[in-house]
Amino acid sequence: MTGSASVNSFYLQMCFCFFLLMLVPQGLRGESNFTVAAASSKIEATLTGDALKVSDSQLKQWVQKAADAVVAYYGRYSVPHLTLQIRSFDGRGVRGGQTFSRYGGFIRIAVGTQTTEDDLNSDWMLTHEMVHLTFPNMQDEHHWIEEGIATYVEPIARIQAGQFSASRMWFELVRDLPKGLPQSGDEGLDHTHTWGRTYWGGALFCFLADVEIRKQTQNKKGLQDALRAILNAGGNMLYDWPIEKALQTGDRAVGVEVLLKLYEQMRDRPMQADLDSLWKQLGIRVENGAAQFNDEAPLAKIREAISAPKPQS
C-alpha cells in the first residue's frame, strides 16, 4: 500500500469514528459504580442513564446518609450486601423506589437529571426503602406492617443520625397520621388495602405500639428495641416469617406483650384511636405550620425518648 493510500485510509477511519460519536446523545453518562460502607455491610451502587446535575460524590454522600440513618436506628445495617441501582429520569427529585429480596438485597431508585444537592439532602425515599430490608418478608395481607414500619421509622432514623428535626417529624406525624384511621367500610388492617390504611394505618400501628411499650416499661423500652431484636434474630427481608413470629420476638425483647395484642385489636376490625388526646398528652400542638412542645405534659418524656439517639449496642 502506498503512503498516500495509508493516509487516506487513516482519515476515513477517523471520520467514521467521529460520525459514530456524534450519534451518541450528549447527555448520556453510560454507567459508573461506587461502594459505600454501612457499619460492617457493603452497598454497591450502579448509576445508569443520562448525566445528572449532581456529581457522583454527591450521590455517594446521599447513599451514605441513608445508610447511616438505618444504622443509627437499628445499631447495624440490615443485610451484609446491598445492590443499589440508580437510574435517571428527565426531571427533578427522587422517585420510583422499590426494594427486593433478590441478590441478597436489591433497591432500585431513580434520580432526576435536574436534581440538586439540596434535593438529595432532603430526600426521605432512599432511607424508607432501606428500612424495608430490616423486617421479615410478610404475606400479602400483612403488607401494611412493612410499609408502616418504613413510614414511621424513616424520619426517626434520620433524626437520630442528625439529618432531620424532631419538630418537623412531629408536625408531619400530626398532619399525616389521621390518614391511617379507619373509614366507613373498613375491615381492619389485614383486610383493608387502601393507600391510607397500608402506609399510614401501618404507621399508626407502630406509633400506638411505641407509646404503649414506653408507658408499660416506664419509658425504658420502645418500638426501636423490639425492631432491633427482630432484625438481630435474623428477621430481615431475605426471610419469610409469619407476622406472629415477628411480633412475639419484639414483645419478648421489650418484656411486655404489646405488639401481638395490638395486632389482634387492629387486624380484623376498624379500631379507632383518639389522636387529639394523644397529641395533648405528649405535649404536641401545631401552630402556624410548626409543632410546639409542652414539656410539662404527662407523656412529654415519652415524646422525647421516641426520637432520642440510642446506643448501637
PLM feature segments, named:
Residues T2-C15:
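Bacterial N-terminal signal peptides that target proteins for export
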Residues Q13-L23:
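Bacterial N-terminal signal peptides
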Residues C17, N236-S313:
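Beta/coil-rich, acidic/histidine-enriched accessory regions frequently appended to metallopeptidases
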Residues R29-G30:
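Boundary at the C-terminal end of the N-terminal hydrophobic targeting segment
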Residues F34-M138, H142:
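Juxtacatalytic substrate-recognition/specificity segment
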Residues K53-K65, T116-N121, M125, D140, ...:
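Soluble non-cytosolic domains of exported or imported proteins
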Residues Y73-I86, N137-H143, A161-M169, K220-A226, ...:
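Surface-exposed patches in mature extracellular/periplasmic domains of secreted proteins
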Residues E141-D210, K215-T217, L223, N232-M237:
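Acidic/His/Gly-enriched intrinsically disordered linker/tail segments
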